[in-house]
């Protein structure tokens, strides 16, 4: 046993997760900020990869600004969502708009303020639930999905 433990191990490292952030930006009238992605045409929350040198709150404010032109005040973490297929863990924060003007970016073809019903109509289940979770006030929620469908907790 000691001989085995003293030998160098050539085990492969387990795959690592990527951490992303997204903002549920809620206007006073209850409408929610969403983007239509340029790469695949889907409606989602503004967000992206968290950079190594920033806090999650700083990262979500940066991503919302870059993708929509809207400045935000970050309120609270409302959910943690793991994409089991791609190894992405998304931290989702409820935010309030604090300035700026809506605009598209290289990552979006449309920026819109949607009602909760429009969110359910336009977004895939795994993205719509993030907005709906942020509105229910019972978070933070922890959920997993395969990129298309939620995976029941268990």
From Swiss-Prot:
Any one GO molecular-function label of the UniProt entry: metal ion binding
Span of the annotated motif Nudix box: 48-69
Keyword Hydrolase: yes
The keyword GTP-binding belongs to this UniProt entry's keyword annotation: no
Binding residues for Mg(2+): 48, 63, 66-67
Domain spans labelled Nudix hydrolase: 15-136
InterPro entries per the UniProt record, alphabetical: Nudix_hydrolase, NUDIX_hydrolase-like_dom_sf, NUDIX_hydrolase_CS, NUDIX_hydrolase_dom
Domain of life per record: Bacteria
Pfam (any one): NUDIX
Keywords: Hydrolase, Magnesium, Metal-binding, Plasmid
Family note: Belongs to the Nudix hydrolase family.
Protein name: MutT-like protein
Organism (species): Streptomyces ambofaciens
């Amino acid at each position: 046993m000691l001989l085995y433990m003293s030998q160098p191990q050539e085990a492969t490292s387990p795959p690592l997760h990527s951490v992303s952030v997204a903002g549920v930006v809620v206007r006073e009238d209850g409408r929610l900020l969403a983007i239509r992605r340029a790469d695949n045409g889907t409606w989602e929350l503004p967000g992206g990869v968290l950079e190594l040198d920033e806090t999650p709150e700083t990262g979500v404010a940066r991503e919302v600004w870059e993708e929509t032109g809207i400045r935000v005040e970050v309120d609270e973490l409302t959910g943690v969502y793991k994409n089991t297929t791609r190894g992405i863990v998304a931290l989702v924060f409820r935010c309030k708009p604090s300035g700026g003007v809506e605009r598209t970016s290289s990552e979006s073809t449309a920026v819109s303020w949607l009602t909760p019903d429009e969110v359910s109509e336009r977004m895939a289940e795994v993205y719509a639930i993030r907005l709906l979770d942020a509105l229910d006030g019972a978070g933070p929620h922890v959920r997993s999905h395969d990129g298309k469908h939620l995976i029941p907790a268990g």
